[in-house]
Amino acid sequence: MSTEYRTGREGEFTYRGHDLDELQEMSLEDVAELLPARQRRTITRGLSEEHHKVLAEARESGTEETANNPIRTHLRDMPVLPEFVGLTFAVYTGQEFERVEVQPEMIGHYLGEFQLTRSSVEHGQAGIGATRSSKFVPLK
């Protein structure tokens, strides 16, 4: 599953043959045709009322405003649309809201893909009594 985007020599972002300005001027239905199948299906079946609230809030807020006060959402299944580029979202991970600054390369993914719900555990040394052999380790 590869997304067709690349940065040209001049540093211009393109997504499936369209630059960012073209993508931002397109309607939601036209953008949906360019997205991968799963995200396209999400949009064509109809976004929920909560999705439309986040979309409306994103359209009325500016980049500087969201940098200081990000758009808070529980919707990890919201597809990243071209009009979200430059905005900052606070995506709920199950414990807290984590900031996500939307870059052009994120178009076509879900918001939840950029904030993990589980953290990797780094185990330290076993405690006293954790194993049978550690019962006889002298205390410091």
Swiss-Prot record:
The keyword Protease does not apply. GO terms for cellular component: cytosolic small ribosomal subunit. One of its GO terms (molecular function) is rRNA binding. Keywords: Ribonucleoprotein, Ribosomal protein, RNA-binding, rRNA-binding. One of its GO terms (biological process) is translation. InterPro entries: Ribosomal_uS19, Ribosomal_uS19_CS, Ribosomal_uS19_euk/arc, Ribosomal_uS19_SF. Pfam families: Ribosomal_S19. Residues 55-74 are annotated as: Disordered. Protein S19 forms a complex with S13 that binds strongly to the 16S ribosomal RNA. Belongs to the universal ribosomal protein uS19 family. NCBIfam families: PRK04038.1, uS19_arch. PANTHER family: RIBOSOMAL PROTEIN S19P FAMILY MEMBER, SMALL RIBOSOMAL SUBUNIT PROTEIN US19. This is Small ribosomal subunit protein uS19. It comes from Halobacterium salinarum (strain ATCC 700922 / JCM 11081 / NRC-1). The lineage of its organism: Archaea, Methanobacteriati, Methanobacteriota, Stenosarchaea group, Halobacteria. The gene is rps19.
